[in-house]
Amino acid sequence: MNYDRILIRYGEMTTKGKNRNIFVRRLKNNIARKLQAFERIQIEYMRDRMYILLNGEPHEPIIEKLKTVFGIHSFSLAMKCENDLDAIKETALAAVRQLPYKGKTFKVSARRVDKQFPYRSDELNYEVGAHILRQTDGLRVNVREPDIDVRIEVRQDGTYVTCRDIFGAGGLPVGTSGKAMLMLSGGIDSPVAGYLAMKRGLEIEAVHFFSPPFTSERAKQKVIDLVRKLTTYGGRIKLHIVPFTEVQQAIYQGVPNEYSLISTRRAMLRITDALRRRQRALAIVTGESLGQVASQTLESMYVINEVTNTPILRPLVSMDKLEIIELAKQIGTHDISILPYEDCCTIFTPRAPKTKPKKEKVFHYESQLDLAPLLEKAVNDTETLVIDEETGQGDEFAELF
């Protein structure tokens, strides 16, 4: 007897009340897309849990993929049997034998959801535990801190047996919180911000500012690779590549050096907001962390934000750099981010950028420029790629958007 299904437990979704079914259906669809290569699996869901019926598919690669699906609190390999004491004993024994149990400790934790079942939970614990002890060597009982917790749940449709919990990614299913535009550079911070935004249920579309010939095709490929890594957690993602050279040169030539960084960020935000309206998103996500660099002081953020009323979400705002780097390593974006290819944020860098810019001065300097047609041209000339986890870079859809 082998494990024939995977039991999935929801996390935060259990607090969603009347909207829970919306979250559960979205999670089911996200899992189905994630596991589309496993053609024989079936997904069954109910209000408080979900099952993946393996139907002969290998469980190891499925488990690895489930670890990256937001909305899953934990999951376990499971076996199902009839609501019969002997069947439950044999199923629990088979579940334990699937594990390296010698020299380990265990306990049985039974839960009788079906009150028509003739044995109480404590009786099940004793009967099943005694059977496992008799039929195995090198396994001992420890009811406080066991190595193996044999969980038995007797429900009306059958009894389910699990032995090991695997923690999921947590959060909410991607797509349940709406859509946002992620301002994605080639650095460490913004991919982590995108990951955390998706963890809160946001579908993201990435916006990258590309300034050839000052930035290379390798820098562009680096961003594509970062988006591909993020698709591990959020599924297919659109990447909007904005030609930014003309805008950046106009600012560099027309705005005093110490204010050029602020005006550049304001232009980026204007363009991202225009793309947001086009894509019907409701927010903008950035990788800003308060106080890290000159453009991320509170005074700078205030002046930069002035160009839009759109909500700006900053998932990293309370994190220090070491925390961000550690999370980047965990999600697999760090090694891509540190590749030595310049992006538009590292060219034309002012020698001494203002950390407390004056809004009136920014307005004055920008009023001397005719940026509006350049911004509109950048939006209209934006190239859009669709990046997919399984197939890599998708087709170009710039003409459709």
From Swiss-Prot:
Residue pairs linked by disulfide bridges in the UniProt entry: none
Chief localisation class: cytoplasm
Entry GO MF terms: ATP binding; CCA tRNA nucleotidyltransferase activity; tRNA binding; tRNA-uracil-4 sulfurtransferase activity
Residues binding ATP: M183, L184, H208, F209, R265, G287, Q296
All residue ranges annotated as the THUMP domain in the record: 60-165
SMART domains: THUMP
GO biological process: thiamine biosynthetic process; thiamine diphosphate biosynthetic process; thiazole biosynthetic process; tRNA 4-thiouridine biosynthesis
Highest rank taxon of the organism: Bacteria
EC primary class: transferase
Pfam families: ThiI, ThiI_fer, THUMP
Compartments reported by the entry: Cytoplasm
Entry keyword set: ATP-binding, Cytoplasm, Nucleotide-binding, RNA-binding, Thiamine biosynthesis, Transferase, tRNA-binding
Enzyme Commission number(s) from the entry: 2.8.1.4
Entry-linked Gene3D superfamilies: 3.30.2130.30, HUPs (3.40.50.620)
Catalytic activity as recorded in UniProt: [ThiI sulfur-carrier protein]-S-sulfanyl-L-cysteine + a uridine in tRNA + 2 reduced [2Fe-2S]-[ferredoxin] + ATP + H(+) = [ThiI sulfur-carrier protein]-L-cysteine + a 4-thiouridine in tRNA + 2 oxidized [2Fe-2S]-[ferredoxin] + AMP + diphosphate; [ThiS sulfur-carrier protein]-C-terminal Gly-Gly-AMP + S-sulfanyl-L-cysteinyl-[cysteine desulfurase] + AH2 = [ThiS sulfur-carrier protein]-C-terminal-Gly-aminoethanethioate + L-cysteinyl-[cysteine desulfurase] + A + AMP + 2 H(+)
Membrane-spanning ranges: none
Pathway(s) it belongs to: Cofactor biosynthesis; thiamine diphosphate biosynthesis
Its job: Catalyzes the ATP-dependent transfer of a sulfur to tRNA to produce 4-thiouridine in position 8 of tRNAs, which functions as a near-UV photosensor. Also catalyzes the transfer of sulfur to the sulfur carrier protein ThiS, forming ThiS-thiocarboxylate. This is a step in the synthesis of thiazole, in the thiamine biosynthesis pathway. The sulfur is donated as persulfide by IscS.
Family of this protein: Belongs to the ThiI family.
Record's protein name: Probable tRNA sulfurtransferase
Lineage summary: Bacteria, Bacillati, Bacillota, Bacilli, Bacillales
